[in-house]
């Protein structure tokens, strides 16, 4: 039964099964809505002003993470 369900899940994925909008938004929040440090490439929260890493001297040289096409 588990194998049957996993196969069904895989088939839906391969056919381009839709992701529920709320789950998609949640995934985007955790993976895409980030700021990136230009010196050390650390992933930071979207409202970050300075980097949290010591190795780049807590620089304020940040950019938004590029969006997936």
Curated annotation (Swiss-Prot):
Cross-link (Glycyl lysine isopeptide (Gly-Lys) (interchain with K-? in acceptor proteins)), chain numbering: 17
The keyword Ribonucleoprotein is annotated on this UniProt entry: yes
Site of covalent link Glycyl lysine isopeptide (Lys-Gly) (interchain with G-Cter in ubiquitin): 4
Any single biological process term in GO: translation
Signal peptide positions on this chain: none
Domain spans labelled Ubiquitin-like: 1-17
Any GO MF annotation of the entry: structural constituent of ribosome
Residues of the site described as Essential for function: 9
GO CC terms of this entry: cytoplasm; nucleoplasm; ribonucleoprotein complex; ribosome
Keywords on record: Cytoplasm, Isopeptide bond, Methylation, Nucleus, Ribonucleoprotein, Ribosomal protein, Ubl conjugation
Record site: Interacts with activating enzyme: 13
Pfam family, one: Ribosomal_L40e
N6,N6,N6-trimethyllysine: modified positions: 39
Additional notes on this entry: Ubiquitin is encoded by 4 different genes. Uba52 and Rps27a genes code for a single copy of ubiquitin fused to the ribosomal proteins eL40 and eS31, respectively. UBB and UBC genes code for a polyubiquitin precursor with exact head to tail repeats, the number of repeats differ between species and strains.
Homology family: In the N-terminal section; belongs to the ubiquitin family. In the C-terminal section; belongs to the eukaryotic ribosomal protein eL40 family.
Protein name from the UniProt record: Ubiquitin-ribosomal protein eL40 fusion protein
Source organism (scientific name): Gallus gallus (Chicken)
């Amino acid at each position: 039964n588990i194998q049957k369900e996993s196969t069904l899940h895989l088939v839906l994925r391969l056919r381009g099964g839709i992701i529920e909008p709320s789950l998609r938004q949640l995934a985007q929040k955790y993976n895409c809505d980030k700021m990136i440090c230009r010196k050390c490439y650390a992933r930071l929260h979207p409202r970050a002003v300075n980097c949290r890493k010591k190795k780049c001297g807590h620089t304020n040289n940040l950019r938004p993470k590029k969006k997936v096409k």
